[in-house]
A protein has these predicted regions:
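Intrinsically disordered, low-complexity segments and flexible domain linkers enriched for serine/proline
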Residues: 1-246
Length: 246
């Protein structure tokens, strides 16, 4: 069983990223030429130090040392962007490449609009090209990983690049596995406790995010507090109690 998101796959020789100049063979609109070929990164949220508090919603959880969250006070902005993306890519947004992104335009480290099997468009980052017809992607606003075909991708136009990446990678402060790695049961237990829920986060520190591939993103180290009516509950304490019963 895989406890955490992997996002990477085996290296494949002869990927699309090795093509010298696909613009010679494709009619590329000037706006796409500027945005897609230069791999301009999306903006990211920056956080002050030292200790501070945030209202967060956990969007995905692998284990206590690897989970992602969104800021609750940014949810309205993300929902507005997602709504606009659905309308745009259902019509003129896909008109440049009606059959999907040409394989020659698929690049590691570039951002695209990706059409998921749930019939929703998302902002995605290509982490690895797995051959000419498959890409490993990271859903930058939700912290999820997946695989997509070029036919499921479209250019991410400038109007959808202004909002900073909304999924932030994090870990619980002072929590380590009893052994070298988290067990599958511990991973499942942690996910059941936090996934999809809102907490008060007490941020203890930060470091560069080396997991997601998002340029200049930060990884936050925090305590998660469930502000229940009967009193504050620390997630790490609940997790320790549940693990003792496994």
């Amino acid at each position: 069983m895989t406890c955490g998101p992997k996002g990477d796959g085996p290296d494949v020789a002869g990927t699309a990223s090795q093509l010298s100049d696909p613009k010679e063979d494709l009619m590329v609109p000037p706006m796409l030429d500027e945005e897609s070929f230069k791999a301009k990164p999306l903006p990211v949220l920056q956080f002050r130090t030292p200790v501070f508090f945030l209202d967060v919603k956990v969007t995905d959880a692998a284990n206590p040392q690897s989970f992602t969250f969104q800021l609750v006070d940014k949810r309205a902005e993300l929902e507005a962007l997602m709504s606009e993306m659905q309308s745009y890519y259902a019509a003129e947004g896909s008109s440049t490449f009606p059959r999907g992104l040409p394989e020659a335009l698929l690049r590691k480290g570039h951002y695209y609009a990706g059409y998921h099997s749930d019939k929703i468009w998302y902002r995605v980052l290509v982490q690895k090209v797995q051959g000419p017809l498959m890409a490993s992607v990271y859903f930058v606003d939700y912290g999820l990983y997946g695989m997509m075909l070029p036919s499921e991708l479209q250019p991410l136009w400038q109007r959808f690049r202004r909002l900073p990446v909304q999924a932030i990678h994090a870990s619980l402060a002072g929590v380590e596995p009893l052994h070298e790695e988290w067990t599958p049961k511990e991973c499942i237990t942690f996910r059941e406790i936090v996934n999809g829920k809102i907490f008060l986060a007490r941020v203890r520190g930060k470091r560069p995010d080396t997991t997601t591939g998002v340029h200049d993103a930060e990884h936050l180290v925090m305590n998660l507090v469930d502000t229940a009516p009967e009193g504050d509950i620390l997630v790490e304490e609940v997790f320790a109690e549940r693990c003792a019963l496994l």
